[in-house]
Curated annotation (Swiss-Prot):
PROSITE patterns: HIS_KIN
Known function: Member of the two-component regulatory system TtrR/TtrS, which is required for synthesis of tetrathionate reductase. Probably functions as a sensor protein kinase which is autophosphorylated at a histidine residue in response to tetrathionate, and transfers its phosphate group to TtrR. During mice infection, the ability to use tetrathionate as an electron acceptor is a growth advantage for S.typhimurium over the competing microbiota in the lumen of the inflamed gut.
Residues modified to Phosphohistidine: H367
Catalytic activity: ATP + protein L-histidine = ADP + protein N-phospho-L-histidine
Location of this chain's protein in the cell: Cell inner membrane
A GO cellular component entry from the record: plasma membrane
A Pfam entry, by short name: HisKA
Protein name, as recorded: Tetrathionate sensor histidine kinase TtrS
Keyword Nucleotide-binding: yes
Record note on disruption phenotype: Mutants are defective in tetrathionate respiration.
Record GO terms (molecular function): ATP binding; phosphorelay sensor kinase activity
Length: 592
């Protein structure tokens, strides 16, 4: 029985030795270096020594870090413990689940109270700045955009005073250590500075500055021997990273709580972070509400000159782009106008070319046909003279008279074409030979001349024309135009043709309506253009010649699609002659 007890004690002793060996090691404590590396090591080295003594076999080292170095060290795991203010503890805890072991209660280093944190807004006593609103337009220095005592608390105080830190005054961040910011204020590099509470008094005790040269803005009453512009919060929290075992964390916590009375630092239970977190939310720096734009904003504040240069360059490029686009738009409109004018000139040249070709063709036809027509008339008239001398009732006399009349009509047609060509070439219109023409007789004559009853027996003519209605025109001009339009309608398949003529306020109007189905709108716009036709056997000259002849008679002609009286689709041709179109009496009238 005694042997078994001895063996059990030996096993427990071995386990204890193994556990102690497992706990033994070297541990790094990352500490926020508010006043630089040398000052931080000197101030906190007694803590590392006390922990090493309280925990045999464990060695603790001090590692001074600024805000950004602290974040990087936690992310990379190069430190196992951290000592920092509650605000940074909240920030770090969002990236790694830290365990808050203790909060600092008091120190025995002979300096001003160092277990609280706040901000004091300092300015030189001889600067003339006595209120927060005197900072408008001035340069205010701070340690870092994320520094709790070195910026955020002062930022909140100035905002509560009605100032807009980013707009009402310029911010300049100097980084750690905070001593440099006080020196810059002393040398007038900045007009005010946001520094941690008690920094001024500690530097004064060390003989680095004279605190009487400075005053505090937004000063608040406090039982501490330090100036402050903000409420005070618990400072310096001791936390362990997740990599630290629970056993070691417990041993360190006991060592902190059970420090000897002569120790430099005395710790207690962790203080609440609720007030700190509420303030971080007020200044929009809480990790649970941070947004990318806040980081961008902080970066922009720290790089104002570079950002200003980039913005200026961007504005110059934008103005240059706008100017170039205005020039392009202006040149584009000018090119469009020039293009329209060019197309108009091209159409005018094309029309002139077509008219020139048409004029040459007309002149050629008139020249070539005039002599045969004259010979036909001479032969017909000679035959008439001989036959009348032999027999007044000879049966060939009516036929010869028709030959003579039709030859004369052909000659008149050629003469009208030659007059039109002469007008197109700029010669004046000769109206002495014009005469009053009965419109109803001209329609009947054309109908008989075209032999419509024999050639197109399915076409029915409907006329509403007064027998007394006359128009003063060159000989056979109206018949030429009517013949072309009537023939076009019949060849297009019309079964009914309506012709209405009436006197209007300023002339004579003749309207011809068919039911041949109408004309395509695209072709309708080019109906009077020479050489435009919808029939394979057509030359595209009929309507073009009609338009020129009507204009030669000082009138106008138009064409459009319109439903016929029988309900079928069709085309309407309207011819209008003015009263002043030229007769020697200067009038187209219904009486002739």
């Amino acid at each position: 029985m005694r042997g078994k007890t001895v063996r059990r004690l030996a096993v427990l002793a071995a386990v204890g030795l193994l556990c102690h060996g497992a706990w033994a090691g070297t541990w790094n404590i990352g500490i926020l270096a508010m006043r630089g590396e040398a000052s931080t090591r000197s101030h906190w080295q007694p803590l590392a020594k006390t922990l090493s003594q309280q925990l045999p076999g464990e060695t603790f080292h001090i590692q001074p870090l600024d805000l950004h170095q602290m974040q990087e060290a936690v992310n990379q795991g190069t430190v196992q413990f951290v000592i920092t203010n509650p605000a940074q503890f909240v920030q770090l805890n969002s990236h790694a689940p830290l365990r808050w072991l203790a909060s600092l209660r008091s120190t025995r280093d002979g300096k001003a109270v160092s277990n609280v944190i706040g901000s004091v807004i300092l300015t030189r006593r001889d600067s003339g700045i006595t209120t927060a609103h005197d900072l408008i337009g001035k340069t205010v220095g701070a340690i870092d955009a994320q520094a709790f005592g070195g910026y955020l608390l002062g930022y909140k105080a100035l905002s509560d005073a009605g100032l807009r830190p980013e707009r009402d005054f310029h911010l300049r961040f100097t980084g750690f250590p905070g001593d440099a910011l006080v020196y810059m204020l002393r040398e007038k590099a900045v007009q005010a500075a946001i520094v941690p509470v008690c920094l001024l008094e500690n530097m004064d005790q060390e003989g680095l500055i004279n605190k009487k040269d400075f005053i505090a803005l937004l000063s608040r009453p406090t039982p501490l021997p330090c100036l402050t512009s903000t409420p005070l919060y618990p400072d310096w929290s001791f936390a362990a990273l997740p990599a630290v075992s629970d056993a070691l964390a417990d041993r360190v916590t006991r060592a902190l709580f059970n420090a000897p009375a002569a120790a430099s630092f005395h710790w207690g239970a962790p203080a609440s972070t609720s007030q700190v977190e509420a303030l971080l939310r007020d200044v929009r720096q809480h990790p649970q509400q941070r947004r990318l734009w806040l980081d961008v904003k902080s970066w922009l504040i720290q790089h104002q000159l570079m950002v200003g240069g980039v913005i200026l360059a961007f504005l110059l490029l934008t103005l240059n782009y706008i100017w170039v686009m205005l020039l392009v738009r202006r040149r584009g409109k000018q090119l469009e106008r020039n293009s329209v004018v060019l197309h108009q000139h091209e159409r005018a040249l094309e029309t002139a070319r077509q008219m020139s070709v048409l004029g040459e063709m007309t002149s050629g036809f008139a020249h070539e046909l005039n002599q045969p027509l004259s010979a036909i008339r001479h032969y017909a008239q000679g035959c008439l003279i001989r036959l009348r001398a032999a027999d007044e009732q000879h049966p060939l006399l009516p036929a010869l008279e028709q030959i003579d009349q039709q030859a004369q009509r052909g000659a008149d047609t050629l003469r009208n074409l030659r007059h039109w060509v002469s007008q197109a070439q700029g010669n004046p219109v000769l109206t002495e030979a014009w005469k009053a023409i009965a419109i109803r007789e001209a329609i009947d004559h054309v109908w008989q001349l075209l032999r419509m009853a024999q050639q197109f027996p399915t076409v029915t003519l409907h006329t509403e024309v007064s027998a007394a209605l006359r128009v003063t025109l060159p000989s056979v001009l109206l018949e030429q135009v009517l013949a072309n339009i009537i023939l076009n309608a019949a060849q297009a398949g019309a079964t009914h043709l309506w012709i209405v003529a009436e006197r209007t306020e300023n002339g004579i109007s003749i309207v011809l309506q068919d039911n041949a189905g109408g004309i395509d709108e695209a072709l309708l716009r080019q109906a009077f253009q020479p050489f435009m036709t919808t029939r394979k056997e057509g030359m595209g000259l009929g309507l073009a010649i009609c338009q020129r002849l009507v204009r030669y008679g000082r009138g106008d002609i138009s064409i459009r699609n319109q439903t016929a009286p029988d309900g079928l689709s069709g085309t309407v041709v309207t011819i209008h002659f003015l009263h002043e179109n030229g007769g020697r009496d200067g009038d187209n009238s219904s009486t002739g």
